[in-house]
Amino acid sequence: MKQSPPPDADDAALALTALAWILGDEARAERFLALTGLTPDALRGALEDRATQAAILTFLTGHENDLVSCAAAIDSDPALLAAAAARLDGTGF
């Protein structure tokens, strides 16, 4: 079976930066944890996991207002966040 390449360091950094933005708002953080099924401890333990990084960015792509707001807050572009999500979850290039 062909192994996936390791996530690009920029994608991982983007996911962690986005996570900081997500966790900056209690309601948004609670929604993220509820939708991903992660507990705070599980999230802390899985930050280096490609699937967790993908889940962070996929959470944003599922909520356009959050995607646009996060991109603006972290000085990025919504399309870059979406592309990183696709690469991390294996659906993109």
Stretch-by-stretch model annotation:
Residues 1-93:
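Metal- and O2-centered redox machinery and metal/ROS homeostasis
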